[in-house]
A protein has these predicted regions:
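Mature catalytic core of soluble alpha/beta enzymes
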Residues: 1-275
Length: 275
């Protein structure tokens, strides 16, 4: 078994797979890099930048990967009655978690996920100006794409881990340590043919105008301050990744929605976790 590691998606991505599959790992990393380029909030040539700059109501050509992620985002937006919203870019720019840029005036971007229309597999229309940030879902999609590539290359088993958002497949149990909000690993779960994602924000906050803000946004576009970790197990990493954000804001709702997506939440406490 070998493990390869690359910086990507704002974290480090590790791929563990059997010896002799180095070329497959390279192709998987290339798929991850493609997702990063297309869905970056920061890069001027990304699909998000094109949607941000487009005239409201204009059809915009984007990568099919971007369409797939936006389609899932819309589905989750409806399933959570609007709580999961990928147009939180305006809030994150205001609190300093995302760069403002020279052209961004926050009052010019009032749109929400319900204003996004999927035209076809390569075209999207935003009916109001908006700042889309896919940081709460794209990493999971990138992990899923890497797994698809590895399988297409004939790799029998592998683990793809993007900073704690991971997916495992094959005939083995992969031991996965769950890192709590304070950075300690107190619980290890076996991962077999599933995806696992965790979120917390104890170490990722800013003081803005006299109050703490985090990267996780809940009801009323307010920051969610969580001193605990939430962990979701699902069949796909895109679902696991997104549902951790919902669970931080409303655990009861997340548990209800998880049932619709063949997922489940792990019970957590300040010192560990249990099924």
């Amino acid at each position: 078994m070998i493990t390869r590691c690359r910086p990507s998606l704002g974290t480090f991505v590790e791929i563990s797979l059997p010896d002799g599959n180095e070329q497959a790992a390279e192709q998987a990393f290339a798929a991850i890099a493609h997702v990063h380029r297309r869905m970056s909030f920061h890069e001027s040539g990304s699909d998000l930048a094109r949607l941000r700059d487009a005239t409201p109501g204009k059809q915009v050509k984007v990568d099919r990967e971007t369409v797939a992620v936006l389609r899932m985002a819309i589905e989750l937006h409806h399933a959570t009655s609007g709580l999961f919203d990928v147009t939180i870019g305006r809030t994150l720019v205001r609190s300093g978690f995302l760069p403002r840029g020279e052209t961004i005036r926050l009052d010019h971007f009032p749109g929400t996920t319900r204003d996004i229309e999927i035209v076809d597999t390569h075209h999207v229309r935003c009916h109001r100006p908006m700042l889309i940030d896919l940081g709460g879902i794209a990493k999971g999609h990138a992990v899923d794409r890497a797994v698809e590539v590895l399988r297409s290359c004939g790799v029998a088993e592998a683990l793809v881990n993007a900073g704690g958002d991971l997916r495992a497949y094959g005939d083995r149990d992969w031991p996965v340590g769950l890192r709590d909000a304070d950075g300690e690993v107190r619980y290890v779960v076996p991962a077999r043919d599933c995806a696992i994602a965790s979120s917390s924000n104890l170490d990722n906050r800013r003081r803005v105008r006299g109050r703490d803000e985090s990267v996780h946004i809940g009801y009323g576009r307010k920051s969610v301050l969580a001193d605990h970790r939430v962990t979701v197990v699902a069949t796909t990493c895109i679902v696991a990744d997104a549902l951790t954000k919902v669970a931080l804001a409303d655990r009861v709702l997340a548990e209800q929605v998880a049932q619709q997506f063949d997922a489940r939440l792990l019970e957590t406490s300040s010192t560990g976790a249990s099924n």
